[in-house]
């Protein structure tokens, strides 16, 4: 009877080996599910934005095309907080296609960011629950197998424990993986480079296509090409250097750099005339009382002035290129030319004022030369070329020019105020005054700031705002991403006002602040050359 009773009891007690086999298979299945889910999260990289024109994306498009962007990298929110406009996950090592466009919809661009983040957070939560269930299976199996009701012998229990350990080996890495995922989800987020890349490349494909056949207006340009918001029409966007060279002669029509190119090109030609013909005919050249070093100082200044003029011509000729990296380097050539001209001007004044005190002359000239070299290297910094760095450029050039004041003060100490003022006066009224007037035009955007044919933007977004501020592409979209310039309010009441002389429409092609700046720089260079000859004559011929 006992045998039959035991036999009937074993029918209801599951076999230890069969139970562990089923437990192992279930754990393996759960692990494969979690592993597959984890891989889908890890491989979700964001390589580029949606290549659509800048228009509204409705919800159907978002859902229908969600499968196209499986390479998106997760934008990890901090727990379940909303991803704000300044919080993104950096997508390192990726860049936008320069010709891609992206549409953000009418609601808010942050909605797109939050939707991706929510999708990933849900995936992570699902994976976490799978791991939790697997861990629960392990603990329940261990508890049931060690229950006294099983009444298994020690050998069986030992074998079952070995199987339990093997199941734990499957569960353990899953728990560690999800802990790592949770840490990644909760880590602080940095501004994404993709927002910056998108905004910087916005309109590039359209501008590249239009630039092959026509000149563009301000709002057809990508953001890095927008420097003077008061100049609206006549922008070049060429894809070859040969087109840029031919634009010197307006081969493809008059553009907004024509007057800037020719103002300094004519100035360069006149400087060559001064160096070849005028200076060799001067009294300073022929008089034996003037030291030979003085003649070389004059030639050094004229060479620096020629370098400045040609660098400016080079920049204004090629700044219409469609290649951003080349354009930035071309701008640095122009800044370097200005730095070299200012440095050479200071060296000429220090030479003539401190010639009787050699140690002071060499000291001042060495310091000025070192600052000039430092300035040339600083000019090649990407930050120096940004539109928001315009005040910095002005302050640096003025600071460099003030080095000449130190030699003037030292001359007063060595002689007297009357002699120093008499010797230095030609530089003041023949050169410095023209530079100062030019700086006023350069920094104030006069006269184009008073144009009334179109509505001008109040500001240009800074480089940091272009990288982090989503309001530029949401709330301010109608300002910075408009298709055509907005007519001024005066044009609505008087349609003919847009083409009248009073509206200042012509500043796009001639008479803008930069052209005036060029004109006064040429006057300052010629004036400084005349001032040097006067100072040399007072110092060595008339004294």
Swiss-Prot record:
<keyword id="KW-0812">Transmembrane</keyword>
<feature type="glycosylation site" description="N-linked (GlcNAc...) asparagine">
    <location>
        <position position="45"/>
    </location>
</feature>
<feature type="glycosylation site" description="N-linked (GlcNAc...) asparagine">
    <location>
        <position position="256"/>
    </location>
</feature>
<dbReference type="GO" id="GO:0005783">
    <property type="term" value="C:endoplasmic reticulum"/>
</dbReference>
<dbReference type="InterPro" id="IPR004254">
    <property type="entry name" value="AdipoR/HlyIII-related"/>
</dbReference>
<feature type="transmembrane region" description="Helical">
    <location>
        <begin position="260"/>
        <end position="280"/>
    </location>
</feature>
<feature type="topological domain" description="Lumenal">
    <location>
        <begin position="1"/>
        <end position="259"/>
    </location>
</feature>
<keyword id="KW-0325">Glycoprotein</keyword>
<feature type="topological domain" description="Cytoplasmic">
    <location>
        <begin position="417"/>
        <end position="425"/>
    </location>
</feature>
<feature type="topological domain" description="Lumenal">
    <location>
        <begin position="317"/>
        <end position="330"/>
    </location>
</feature>
<feature type="transmembrane region" description="Helical">
    <location>
        <begin position="426"/>
        <end position="446"/>
    </location>
</feature>
<feature type="transmembrane region" description="Helical">
    <location>
        <begin position="358"/>
        <end position="378"/>
    </location>
</feature>
<feature type="topological domain" description="Cytoplasmic">
    <location>
        <begin position="354"/>
        <end position="357"/>
    </location>
</feature>
<feature type="topological domain" description="Cytoplasmic">
    <location>
        <begin position="281"/>
        <end position="295"/>
    </location>
</feature>
<comment type="function">
    <text>ADIPOR-like receptor involved in zinc metabolism either by altering membrane sterol content or by directly altering cellular zinc levels.</text>
</comment>
<dbReference type="GO" id="GO:0006882">
    <property type="term" value="P:intracellular zinc ion homeostasis"/>
</dbReference>
<feature type="transmembrane region" description="Helical">
    <location>
        <begin position="506"/>
        <end position="526"/>
    </location>
</feature>
<feature type="transmembrane region" description="Helical">
    <location>
        <begin position="396"/>
        <end position="416"/>
    </location>
</feature>
<keyword id="KW-0472">Membrane</keyword>
<feature type="glycosylation site" description="N-linked (GlcNAc...) asparagine">
    <location>
        <position position="153"/>
    </location>
</feature>
<feature type="topological domain" description="Cytoplasmic">
    <location>
        <begin position="527"/>
        <end position="543"/>
    </location>
</feature>
<dbReference type="GO" id="GO:0038023">
    <property type="term" value="F:signaling receptor activity"/>
</dbReference>
<feature type="glycosylation site" description="N-linked (GlcNAc...) asparagine">
    <location>
        <position position="123"/>
    </location>
</feature>
<keyword id="KW-0256">Endoplasmic reticulum</keyword>
<keyword id="KW-1133">Transmembrane helix</keyword>
<dbReference type="Pfam" id="PF03006">
    <property type="entry name" value="HlyIII"/>
</dbReference>
<feature type="topological domain" description="Lumenal">
    <location>
        <begin position="379"/>
        <end position="395"/>
    </location>
</feature>
<feature type="glycosylation site" description="N-linked (GlcNAc...) asparagine">
    <location>
        <position position="319"/>
    </location>
</feature>
<dbReference type="GO" id="GO:0005789">
    <property type="term" value="C:endoplasmic reticulum membrane"/>
</dbReference>
<comment type="similarity">
    <text>Belongs to the ADIPOR family.</text>
</comment>
<feature type="transmembrane region" description="Helical">
    <location>
        <begin position="296"/>
        <end position="316"/>
    </location>
</feature>
<protein>
    <recommendedName>
        <fullName>ADIPOR-like receptor IZH3</fullName>
    </recommendedName>
</protein>
<feature type="topological domain" description="Lumenal">
    <location>
        <begin position="447"/>
        <end position="505"/>
    </location>
</feature>
<feature type="transmembrane region" description="Helical">
    <location>
        <begin position="331"/>
        <end position="353"/>
    </location>
</feature>
